[in-house]
Amino acid sequence: MLKLGIFMMPIHPANKNLVDCLEEDRNLVIKADKLNYSEAWMGEHYSSSGEPVPSPFIFNASLISETKKIKFGTGVISLPQQHPAIVAGHAALFDNLSKGRFLFGVGAGGLVSDWELFDNLDGKTRALTMLDSIDAILSIWNSNCLLYTSPSPRDWTI
């Protein structure tokens, strides 16, 4: 059976009121749920006034109680911009709050302005950090202790 999903790339005019932008985007996901869409994906951008969602976790959490079946995806969490322990915790909490309606999408980031903001301009470093973050997140989820030493340029110890 064919399933429909929606990828939210909520591009809004820069001068549009932020509250109105977010409400419009929320209403779109609520409507998608009522139309039996199976999933809704929201991206993460910090430096774009046109895509005003720095946390898909928080945006999606605002919709849990207003929807019935739709699954919520992060499209994507930019791993080089965040500590993997924070991402692991937020993802696990969201999955539990949504009663399993969570789809975990990760990546190395897509906006040059975000790379500049977080001083992640080197593509090789971003890619290595992303891969290392995935290992760290899986290690956190699959163990009883939070001991992880990163081989990446970010040198995380958890």
Regions found by a protein language model. Give the residues of each.
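Flexible, glycine-rich active-site loops centered on histidine and acidic residues
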Residues: 2-20, 81-147
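Single conserved hydrophobic/aromatic residue that forms the stacking wall/gate
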Residues: 148-158
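Structural motif
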Residues: 43, 75, 105-107
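Active-site nucleophile and cofactor-binding loops and adjacent substrate-binding regions
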Residues: 74-82
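Conserved protein kinase catalytic core
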Residues: 50, 113, 158
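N-terminal beta1-alpha1-beta2 module of alpha/beta enzyme domains
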Residues: 1-72, 148
